Regions:
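Conserved Rossmann-like nucleotide-cofactor binding loop
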Residues: 10, 33, 228
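Conserved flavin/dinucleotide-binding core of flavoenzymes
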Residues: 94-95, 285-402
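Active-site/ligand-binding neighborhood in enzyme catalytic cores
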Residues: 89, 104-220, 224, 228
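Dinucleotide-binding Rossmann-like beta1-alpha1 core, especially the glycine-rich loop
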Residues: 44-118, 143
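Short loop/edge segments at beta-strand edges and connector loops
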Residues: 6, 76, 206-211, 377
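Mid-domain catalytic core of redox enzymes
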Residues: 210-315, 331, 364-365
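Glycine-rich FAD pyrophosphate-binding loop
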Residues: 19-42
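N-terminal Rossmann-like FAD-binding beta1-loop-alpha1 element of flavoenzymes
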Residues: 2-27
Length: 402
């Protein structure tokens, strides 16, 4: 018997990989049901994704979709257009001609000196300024990465973001080649629902609404929880690792899907990122009905607000409509009121790890884990649903070898 603690994406994926290896599996989850943050809500206006809206399509995700018999829905051609807001309008390339020339010159000089890779303890802000100049950091690197990591560039470790020290025990990973973005035809929730159904059909035992308690060294275990929960569980068995995990700062995001009446002037594309210097409070906006088909008859937009590791306030449920309207006015010049809002997720704790130097320390100390114990989660050096699936498979392989 192998025990998996956590029934979010990482825990369910680890359980699946264990059953593929012939193991008997039990899953313990503190929440009332599976899925963690991932959920698709179907409303009268269209689908609302509570967390990630799609998978990077590569060999890993293609295999998962095939194994679970899920039909992939590819992103629309319009989603290839991505924008960064500068000087009052969205731009495909936010740097001026002079700034672009400066970026090319600096990057070329760094390449000649073989100095493109991040230095030890170098932040994203320091690295991108060294390689491309201050405008590159301000208008390109910082907004692009705040849209992924929800943290400011001067808090992000360049080595942690760009792969750090590789996999466990310093091994180098080969990333599967990306071929765009896809989602299940029924939304991201379909992936969770199908995986949960198939696991139950395979005889996996689920216990919901249960705390896991202390880990039992006689039971091979995968901990697939948040970083704070994992630190507490791991502490008796790998104290140095648990200490590092517990020191990872966590940040919060609030995403609200708003439905609008379409107009001929609507921006066509994946979405827009907003540098902090623009005065727009949102980190970014996703144009859902431009990214995937069947996301609603009207215009569906998801506005994302983040605390940036405590640097910014988050809107309250009563403020979010006003925030969206003001930010949308800055983007479009219009003051349209949403036709409807998607449901709020109330009281969610900080869920995203800040990828600072501590993440690298965690990677270094993974070797402290006893053979019967493995970890899976978004604090281990890989973000994004496709990469979390890889981590879950590696965790399952580790305990299955025992």
């Amino acid at each position: 018997m192998v025990r998996v603690i956590g029934a979010g994406l990482s825990g369910l994926a680890a359980a699946w990989c264990l059953t593929e290896a012939g193991a008997e599996v039990e899953v313990v989850e503190a929440a009332a049901g599976p899925g963690g943050l991932i959920e698709t809500v179907r409303t009268a206006e269209g689908r609302v994704e509570r967390a990630a809206n799609g998978f990077v399509w590569n060999e890993t995700t293609e295999r998962w979709f095939r194994d679970l018999e899920i039909a992939p829905s590819p992103s629309n051609d319009a989603s290839r257009r991505r924008f960064i807001f500068r000087d009052g309008r969205p731009r495909r390339w936010p740097l001026t001609v002079g700034e672009t020339a400066g970026l090319a010159a600096r990057a070329g000089w760094a390449w000649l000196r073989r100095d493109l890779k991040p230095h030890d303890a170098e932040t994203i802000a320091a690295w991108s300024t060294r390689i491309g100049g201050a405008p590159t950091t301000q208008w390109l690197a910082a907004p692009a990465l705040q849209g992924i990591y929800a943290a400011p560039a001067d808090r992000l470790s360049a080595k942690a973001v760009f792969g750090g020290r590789g996999g466990r025990r310093g091994t180098r990973r080969r990333r599967p080649r990306s071929r765009g973005i896809v989602a299940p035809a029924g939304g991201m929730g379909e992936f969770i629902e199908r995986l949960f159904e198939r696991l139950r059909a395979r005889g996996v035992d689920f216990s919901f609404g249960c705390s896991s308690g202390a880990l039992d060294p006689s039971v091979p275990t995968i901990v697939a929880t948040s970083a704070p929960a994992a630190a507490a569980l791991v502490a008796p068995h790998a104290p140095r690792l648990a200490e590092a995990i517990g020191l990872i700062p966590m940040t919060s995001i609030v995403s609200t899907t708003a439905f609008f009446t379409p107009t001929s002037s609507d921006l066509r594309g994946f979405g827009v990122l907003f540098p902090r210097e623009t005065g727009v409070r949102a980190l970014g906006v996703l144009f859902n009905t431009e990214i995937f088909k069947d996301r609603g008859a009207g215009r569906s937009e998801t506005w994302i607000y983040g605390s940036l590791a405590g640097a910014l306030p988050l809107p309250s449920p009563g403020e979010v409509v006003d925030w969206i309207r003001e930010d949308r006015r800055r983007l479009t010049g219009r003051t349209d009121r949403p036709v409807a809002l998607g449901p709020e997720r109330a009281g969610a704790p900080p869920s995203l790890p800040v990828y600072d130097q501590t993440v690298l320390t965690v990677q270094e100390r993974l070797a402290d884990l006893p053979p019967w114990l493995a970890l899976a989660g978004n604090y281990l050096g890989r973000l994004g649903v496709a990469r979390l699936l890889d981590l879950s498979r590696e965790a399952a392989e580790r305990v299955a070898r025992r």
